[in-house]
A protein has these predicted regions:
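Bacterial N-terminal signal peptides that target proteins for export
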Residues: 1-8
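Surface-exposed interaction regions that form or flank ligand-binding interfaces
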Residues: 13
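C-terminal motif of bacterial Sec signal peptides marking the signal peptidase cleavage site
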Residues: 16-19
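Loop and turn regions of beta-sandwich accessory domains that flank beta-strands and are enriched
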Residues: 68, 130-232
Length: 232
């Protein structure tokens, strides 16, 4: 059994090494890529800028600087960011830096907006994958961002949830302006909401009018999942 385990690990290591060899460009190739990003979440605090430096790497080094043009896409408003139209890899180097600044302009606390940055390929240069930033408005220092998503079933009107400030005895956010059911009446799909919670003590409560289980629900604080259910 021990030999089998050893051989298995050796096989996995060789397979992983072979896989990496297939994905990495050979030295000297005219190829450039952004540093690895598997989605990047950006939260911009009120009245502040959020600078983000992104590294760009090439597979070769040349004696002259190289300028790579960029294309921007997504639904993030142009006033919400500053991005150069190109990035430069200096002479005698294989690394450049793209300086991006996200701004507190036309951001939404509930719905993330996206900005995708692409390097333009040319006959002289192959490029890697795009990078996409998910950008949202954050909260002031001392407050946490509460964000909730509720997937509605066939009877959306029977769901009522609220967050209660137990120190003040007050409802700070709910899916209905008046305590009670009906806030989601006529709606479908996934409904989202968010707010900023100052430091304090809070209780999340959810009610189902027919007590037969509502749709899936989850909520986070500052991006960290606190609760999730499958709707059962």
């Amino acid at each position: 059994m021990k030999k089998l385990k050893l051989y298995s690990l050796l096989f996995i290591a060789v397979a992983a090494f072979s896989s990496c060899e297939e994905e990495v460009e050979a030295p000297g190739t005219a190829y450039a890529s952004f540093e690895a990003y598997l989605g990047k979440d950006i939260t911009v605090s009120p009245n502040t800028d959020f600078p983000q430096a992104v590294k760009v790497y090439s597979a070769n080094i040349t004696g002259s600087a190289r300028t790579i043009d960029l294309t921007l896409s997504g639904n993030l408003d142009a006033s919400s960011y500053e991005v150069p139209t190109s990035v430069v890899i200096p002479a005698n180097s294989n690394e450049g830096t793209l300086n991006v600044v996200f701004k507190d302009q036309n951001l939404d606390i509930i719905t993330d907006k996206t900005l995708t940055i692409s390097m333009n390929e040319s006959a002289e240069l192959s490029v890697g994958e795009d990078i996409t930033f998910n950008v949202a408005k954050g909260c002031n220092a001392g407050s946490s961002k509460f964000k909730i998503a509720v997937s509605l079933d066939d009877w959306p009107e029977e769901v009522y949830w609220r967050v209660v400030d137990t120190d003040a005895g007050a409802i700070v956010i709910a899916n209905n302006a008046t305590p009670g059911y009906g806030g989601y009446a006529g709606l479908t799909g996934t409904q989202r909401d968010a707010t900023c919670l100052p430091t304090g003590n809070y209780v999340f409560e959810i009610f189902d009018g027919y007590e037969d289980g509502a749709g899936a629900l989850s909520f986070t604080l500052d991006g960290v999942q606190v609760f999730s259910s499958n709707g059962g």
